[in-house]
Amino acid sequence: MEDFVRQCFNPMIVELAEKAMKEYGENLKIETNKFAAICTHLEVCFMYSDFHFINEQGESIIVELDDPNALLKHRFEIIEGRDRTMAWTVVNSICNTTGAEKPKFLPDLYDYKENRFIEIGVTRREVHIYYLEKANKIKSEKTHIHIFSFTGEEMATKADYTLDEESRARIKTRLFTIRQEMASRGLWDSFVSPREAKKQLKKDLKSQEQCAGSLTKVSRRTSPALRILEPMWMDSNRTATLRASFLKCPKK
């Protein structure tokens, strides 16, 4: 699973996930499913904010990243992916500026158009079950909840999906692709089932032992986007390029 994550996701997302797990004292070598889940959640949060800006009239517009109008205000503030101290600093700043009620738990995004915090969920189960779990945990009508599944289903507070249909379709397509890629490698069942995950962990550890000593150093590029958490969209060409840059365990 760890190899899959490093091949499938943008290196910046992988690095953020590694930092998050380290902050909470979690071992990504052991909790590989959580590693994959965090990377998936991060990417969905970035895609959610992708290309969405607010113009001078306060209207929400969609602009490509290479458009000169990209200097307009981002519609969404990304909170997910920051260390806890910085994340709460951002939340406090938003609350002081907008008058929004401070949430009890760290949300994932803030929507400057609708003036509300957003909690993003990505689930391998039924969307309505996960939605209820989120709602019971947050216990606040002020925080908007939006849940996506790997099967293309979604659920949001008061059926308000925030984004246009095309933007949501990109997220659903990406999640479905991740599921298909996992399935093709025999990883999906272990990603869904804890029992299967234990079996897969044993296979992963055995595979790592076989690969020990065969890896060479891979250069890491640090993008400015990592520091400012700019949104990104992993198109097929970019994914193919990233995959080519990573090493695989040599076939014997």
UniProtKB/Swiss-Prot annotation:
Location relative to the cell: Host cytoplasm; Host nucleus
A biological-process GO annotation: viral translational frameshifting
Residues with site note (Important for efficient shutoff activity and nuclear localization): 195, 198-199
Marked site: Important for efficient shutoff activity: 28, 65, 202-203, 206
UniProt keyword terms in alphabetical order: Decay of host mRNAs by virus, Eukaryotic host gene expression shutoff by virus, Host cytoplasm, Host gene expression shutoff by virus, Host mRNA suppression by virus, Host nucleus, Host-virus interaction
Database matches in Pfam families: Flu_PA (PF00603)
Primary localization class, coarse: host cell
Record carries keyword ATP-binding: no
An annotated Gene Ontology molecular function: RNA binding
Keyword Signal listed: no
Residues annotated as catalytic: 80, 108
Family: Belongs to the influenza viruses PA-X family.
Protein's job: Plays a major role in the shutoff of the host protein expression by cleaving mRNAs probably via an endonuclease activity. This host shutoff allows the virus to escape from the host antiviral response. Hijacks host RNA splicing machinery to selectively target host RNAs containing introns for destruction. This may explain the preferential degradation of RNAs that have undergone co- or post-transcriptional processing.
Domain remarks: The probable endonuclease active site in the N-terminus and the basic amino acid cluster in the C-terminus are important for the shutoff activity. The C-terminus acts as a nuclear localization signal. The C-terminus is recruited to host protein complexes involved in nuclear Pol II RNA processing.
Protein's name according to its UniProt entry: Protein PA-X
Gene: PA
